[in-house]
């Protein structure tokens, strides 16, 4: 009996403990079922939310391009980020982000974009962006090397071509020296003009070089009556008058020769002083008008022969002695303003805004309408 009572007590305690465990298991299973039901409901809600289409502007690319052309790069970047947050499947917009960062030379933004793509595990887009970034970086290095080589070549050419420039200056000075010779010839021609009374005043005009008909006998009579006032030039004046009277009597009608035309071209017009002769009172019988068929008279100027001085000098041919054009003939056909525009654009891509602005401001007056529009776009790019 002593052993039966504790055995019964232990049996009752065991039964009570078993009942409690069953109740706890039942309550835990009910909690698990409730959690499963809640998870199923949340997943169904997520699927329904994913199935609902995201409304995105179909002309998003045109809007982004328009903002980039205007120069509002920050607004374009904000629009791209907003679109990617609403629809992460638009992978082509990541390339737009890369272009914007390259335009702004934002290396930090490019690194953040690459890290974001690595976290999202978008390996295809990441490979495209890394390849494009590598190509643009290589192109910038090539352009920088080309610009440095051009500047070095220009400096070397200017250093080596300085003796040729001095020689060209000397050649131009030698071409301009014959001017005093012409002055000397004109002075000599003026000193050779004799002062006796003219035989007959002849009105010379540029349109007609012929002289009206005159009576030779009257000219000879006037030549006999000529008296020279200065005593020093007596001999020279007499010889000159005789030569003129002979040539007036023997010369056929013809136009002025080539020497006279050359002298008109090389010499200025010399106004001969008109000397009034005193009237001679001689009994003259009334003239009888008889028409004589005499050849027309042409007057010739008698000047001492001057070798090569009376011929018109040919126009001096200006030879371009620019050492750059001699070394690189293709530079003569280049448009400097267009070249400066392209160079300014390269400076902007490299980040040298100050030098690009200097180039655009220097050539603003030389630009055409299209070039002005391009320069305004470049200035907007720098300002943004």
UniProtKB/Swiss-Prot annotation:
Gene disruption phenotype: Deletion of the gene results in dispersed T4P localization. It also results in diffuse, cytoplasmic localization of PilG and FimL.
The keyword Manganese belongs to this UniProt entry's keyword annotation: no
Protein task: Localization determinant of type IV pili (T4P) machinery. Plays a role in regulating T4P positioning by connecting the Pil-Chp chemosensory system to subcellular T4P localization. FimV likely recruits FimL and PilG to the cell membrane where T4P are assembled.
Stretch list, region Disordered: 27-46
Main localization (coarse): membrane
Taxonomic lineage: Bacteria, Pseudomonadati, Pseudomonadota, Gammaproteobacteria, Moraxellales
Compartments, record wording: Cell inner membrane
Cellular component aspect of the GO annotation: plasma membrane
Cross-referenced InterPro entries: FimV_C_sf
Membrane topology: Single-pass membrane protein
Protein name according to UniProt: Type IV pili machinery localization factor FimV
């Amino acid at each position: 009996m002593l052993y039966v009572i504790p055995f019964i007590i232990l049996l009752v305690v065991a039964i009570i403990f078993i009942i409690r465990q069953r109740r706890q298991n039942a309550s835990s299973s009910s909690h698990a079922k409730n959690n499963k039901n809640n998870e199923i409901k949340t997943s169904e809600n997520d699927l329904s939310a994913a199935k609902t289409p995201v409304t995105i502007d179909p002309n998003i690319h045109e809007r982004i391009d328009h903002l980039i052309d205007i120069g509002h790069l920050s607004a374009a970047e904000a629009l791209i980020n907003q679109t990617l947050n609403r629809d992460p499947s638009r992978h082509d917009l990541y390339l737009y982000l890369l272009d914007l960062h390259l335009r702004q030379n934002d290396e930090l933004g490019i690194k953040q974009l690459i890290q974001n793509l690595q976290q999202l595990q978008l390996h295809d887009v990441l490979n495209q962006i890394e390849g494009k970034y590598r190509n643009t970086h290589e192109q910038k290095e090539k352009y920088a090397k080309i610009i440095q080589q051009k500047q070095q070549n220009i400096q070397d050419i200017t250093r080596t071509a300085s003796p040729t420039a001095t020689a060209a200056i000397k050649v131009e000075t030698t071409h301009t020296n014959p001017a005093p010779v012409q002055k000397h010839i004109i002075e000599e021609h003026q000193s050779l003009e004799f002062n006796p009374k003219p035989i007959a005043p002849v009105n010379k005009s540029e349109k007609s070089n012929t002289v009206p008909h005159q009576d030779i006998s009257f000219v000879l009579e006037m030549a006999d009556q000529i008296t020279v006032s200065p005593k020093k030039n007596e001999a020279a004046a007499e010889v000159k008058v005789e030569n003129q009277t002979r040539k007036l009597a023997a010369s056929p009608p013809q136009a002025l020769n080539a020497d006279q035309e050359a002298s008109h071209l090389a010499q200025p017009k010399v106004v001969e002083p008109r000397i009034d002769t005193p009237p001679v009172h001689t009994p003259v019988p009334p003239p009888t008008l008889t028409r004589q068929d005499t050849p027309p008279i042409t007057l010739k100027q008698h000047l001492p022969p001057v070798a090569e001085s009376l011929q018109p000098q040919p126009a001096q041919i200006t030879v371009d002695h620019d050492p750059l054009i001699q070394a690189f003939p293709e530079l003569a056909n280049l448009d400097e303003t267009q070249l400066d525009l392209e160079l300014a654009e390269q400076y902007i891509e490299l980040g040298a805004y100050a030098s690009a602005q200097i180039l655009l401001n220097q050539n603003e007056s030389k630009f055409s309408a299209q070039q002005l529009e391009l320069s305004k776009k470049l200035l907007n790019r720098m300002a943004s």
